[in-house]
């Protein structure tokens, strides 16, 4: 059998959200930064992303990451995040998945009771700490990038829901944060179609009306998704939220970068005190925890350094092939 390409992956989920780690088979991407390597792959090898994210190997809500060499002295490896629409700047559930895999599979030197993992991502360097008892990885906490409110109390007009008001905040990606209660949007599986329509309409309207540019990373220059908050199902949770991002993709986890942005938003609005913990619940009831480590600035913008905690589990290993004779080898999507 003659094949065009073979790709090896580790299959992980974080709070229910898939994360496919590509460990071999990728072309070597040139570049001194992760952003440069991402740009090269987007220009020269985007068909690999489509093959691994789209059906029949993936699905409309698939997510993954390409391992690459580190670009900073404290990192163990780098990652390029991929999804159904393209490439992202940050992925907190991906950081948790990568860190879990790195410790479970011995990609880093392991120490009891906690192992450090350094990751270079498009949004910058991220440091994670994984509980390790000598046999199994446990919860992961990571120090998020500086997070902040970009604009408060901004409004957009949507075709189906009218005027929607919320905050634009950054936690590794820009999100439009909004309360779902006024729009009868419970954060539950049964409401997913309405949540998707709402999130997609708000994201499109916000990107059209509010140009965003990260003060220090100009390549981060769009609103990645809508985060809709409402009441949780578990009494120990602070809130539930649903992130609709990329091309109408729904995060099954509570969204790591979104949790970082939410921590910044609540803290800067006086709704989360230093030392308090946000217990953030997902659409399927899984939980991330977030808290403020310290205050900082990004350019002239007041910001905080959040810590986000969650758990991931390896659920498989795979070898994928690309066969040019297959008319669907680079995938398709049916919603």
UniProtKB/Swiss-Prot annotation:
<dbReference type="InterPro" id="IPR053425">
    <property type="entry name" value="Hydroxyproline_Metab_Enz"/>
</dbReference>
<feature type="active site" description="Proton acceptor">
    <location>
        <position position="91"/>
    </location>
</feature>
<protein>
    <recommendedName>
        <fullName>Trans-3-hydroxy-L-proline dehydratase</fullName>
        <ecNumber>4.2.1.77</ecNumber>
    </recommendedName>
</protein>
<dbReference type="InterPro" id="IPR008794">
    <property type="entry name" value="Pro_racemase_fam"/>
</dbReference>
<comment type="similarity">
    <text>Belongs to the proline racemase family.</text>
</comment>
<dbReference type="GO" id="GO:0050346">
    <property type="term" value="F:trans-L-3-hydroxyproline dehydratase activity"/>
</dbReference>
<dbReference type="Pfam" id="PF05544">
    <property type="entry name" value="Pro_racemase"/>
</dbReference>
<feature type="binding site">
    <location>
        <begin position="256"/>
        <end position="257"/>
    </location>
    <ligand>
        <name>substrate</name>
    </ligand>
</feature>
<feature type="binding site">
    <location>
        <begin position="92"/>
        <end position="93"/>
    </location>
    <ligand>
        <name>substrate</name>
    </ligand>
</feature>
<comment type="subunit">
    <text>Homodimer.</text>
</comment>
<comment type="function">
    <text>Catalyzes the dehydration of trans-3-hydroxy-L-proline (t3LHyp) to Delta(1)-pyrroline-2-carboxylate (Pyr2C). Together with LhpI, is involved in a t3LHyp degradation pathway to L-proline, which allows A.brasilense to grow on t3LHyp as a sole carbon source.</text>
</comment>
<keyword id="KW-0456">Lyase</keyword>
<comment type="pathway">
    <text>Amino-acid degradation.</text>
</comment>
